[in-house]
Every structure is written in C-alpha cells, then in structure tokens.
Swiss-Prot record:
Annotated function: Potent anti-inflammatory agent. At low concentrations, mediates the degranulation of mast cells thus evoking an inflammatory response. Also acts as a neurotoxin capable of blocking a class of voltage-gated potassium channels.
Residue positions, PTM N6-formyllysine: 29, 44, 48
Signal peptide as annotated in the record: 1-27
Molecular functions (GO terms): potassium channel regulator activity; toxin activity
GO cellular component: extracellular region
Protein name: Mast cell degranulating peptide
Domain of life of the source: Eukaryota
Species for this entry: Apis mellifera (Honeybee)
Sites of Asparagine amide modification: 49
InterPro entries: Bee_toxin
Disulfide cysteine pairs (residue numbers): 30-42, 32-46
Length: 50
C-alpha cells in the first residue's frame, strides 16, 4: 500500500518537473524573434532549432 502511494507520488512529481521544464522552453522557442526575458536561453534554443 505504502509503496503504491510512493510510486504514484514519484510518477506525479516526474510529470510535474518535466512539464515545469518543458513549458518555458516551448514558450521561449515561440518567442525567439521577440525580446525575451531570458535572451541567452533563447539564443541557445534558437541555435539548436534554427
């Protein structure tokens, strides 16, 4: 029972962390041509993805 809860919690936290990191990179990628809050990250992503 406890291991099941722990497994579920771990799974949820992984999804949360992934979405937390993926969402800003997606939005930065979309705003590459505009002035972005973090231009160095944007430049890095733009360099990778054209």
């Amino acid at each position: 029972m406890i291991s099941m809860l722990r497994c579920t919690f771990f799974f949820l936290s992984v999804i949360l962390i992934t979405s937390y990191f993926v969402t800003p990179t997606m939005s930065i990628k979309c705003n590459c041509k505009r002035h972005v809050i973090k231009p160095h990250i944007c430049r890095k992503i733009c360099g990778k993805n054209g």
